[in-house]
Amino acid sequence: MATTTTEATKTSSTNGEDQKQSQNLRHQEVGHKSLLQSDDLYQYILETSVYPREPESMKELREVTAKHPWNIMTTSADEGQFLNMLIKLVNAKNTMEIGVYTGYSLLATALALPEDGKILAMDVNRENYELGLPIIEKAGVAHKIDFREGPALPVLDEIVADEKNHGTYDFIFVDADKDNYINYHKRLIDLVKIGGVIGYDNTLWNGSVVAPPDAPMRKYVRYYRDFVLELNKALAADPRIEICMLPVGDGITICRRIS
């Protein structure tokens, strides 16, 4: 049956409203910890495979961290589980973590390491680390951690300066100041062994990497967005590594050094 002018106008108007609504949805403030579009699906993942297997110490630290005003900085529970398994899969023993916060990912790493495993952990804020330290100590893994308070770059420069340290790290996790990720990578690529892994957190950065330029964002999200985009391009073009970007937590890029 032929469509009348009025019906066509209504259809056009409806389509226009649908497009506007879709555009408005895309312009909502970005800031969800999980990048899954379905909260129910994410909750299903947590309740089915994450929380039932989460060590009691990690659960306790997660709950303590949830009360902290900057709790959004913590590693998500599903990402903690992923890191724990990844470290076991690569048989990591000598590791490094840049950016600790209260230590959730640090604890996930320490629990996965063998008894003589080591973590060089760096963060500018010892107070946050000490919030989780009693739980880490109770879990019996504090002896694996060498915590250094202060900016990571000077420490890395000192380590890189000694060629004996080159290629000695099995696994490195970075969840720190995004504006220095490129600077970290330039140093870490020499420190991780061939076949070793570097994990960069927040590489999808609240989904902002695909947000329109005029999308409402929190100031810190907008500020660091370009640095994350720069890192992602650099990693994709780096012939010394194989990469895999995963939508776990806020996005994590796994880099395996091949040369």
Curated annotation (Swiss-Prot):
Disordered: annotated segments: 1-29
Effect of deleting the gene: No visible phenotype, but slightly smaller when grown in short days conditions. 70% and 85% reduction in scopoletin and scopolin levels respectively in the roots. Reduction in global lignin content and in hydroxycinnamic acid amides content in pollen.
Any one biological process term the GO annotation gives: lignin biosynthetic process
Pathway of action: Aromatic compound metabolism; phenylpropanoid biosynthesis
Known catalytic reactions: (E)-caffeoyl-CoA + S-adenosyl-L-methionine = (E)-feruloyl-CoA + S-adenosyl-L-homocysteine + H(+)
One cellular-component annotation, GO: plasma membrane
Residues engaged in binding substrate: K33, D175, N206
Domain of life: Eukaryota
EC number: 2.1.1.104
Low complexity: bias regions: 1-14
UniProt-annotated binding residues for S-adenosyl-L-methionine: T75, E97, G99, V100, S105, D123, A152, D177
A Gene Ontology molecular function term of the record: caffeoyl-CoA O-methyltransferase activity
Annotated cofactor note: Binds 1 divalent metal cation per subunit.
Tagged with keyword Transmembrane helix: no
Keywords linked to the UniProt accession: Acetylation, Lignin biosynthesis, Metal-binding, Methyltransferase, S-adenosyl-L-methionine, Transferase
Binding-site list for a divalent metal cation: D175, D201, N202
EC supergroup of this enzyme: transferase
InterPro entries the UniProt entry points to: Cation-dep_OMT (IPR050362), SAM-dependent_MTases_sf (IPR029063), SAM_O-MeTrfase (IPR002935)
Modified residues (N-acetylalanine): A2
PROSITE patterns, sorted: SAM_OMT_I
Cofactor dependency: a divalent metal cation
Tissues of expression: Expressed in stems and roots. Detected in leaves, siliques, flower buds, flowers. Expressed in the tapetum, but not in the endothecium. Detected in the vascular system of leaves and all flower organs, including stigma, stamens, petals and sepals.
Family listed: Belongs to the class I-like SAM-binding methyltransferase superfamily. Cation-dependent O-methyltransferase family. CCoAMT subfamily.
Role of this protein: Methylates caffeoyl-CoA to feruloyl-CoA. Has a very low activity with caffeic acid and esculetin. Involved in scopoletin biosynthesis in roots.
Full protein name: Caffeoyl-CoA O-methyltransferase 1
Species per Swiss-Prot/TrEMBL record: Arabidopsis thaliana
Originating gene: CCOAOMT1
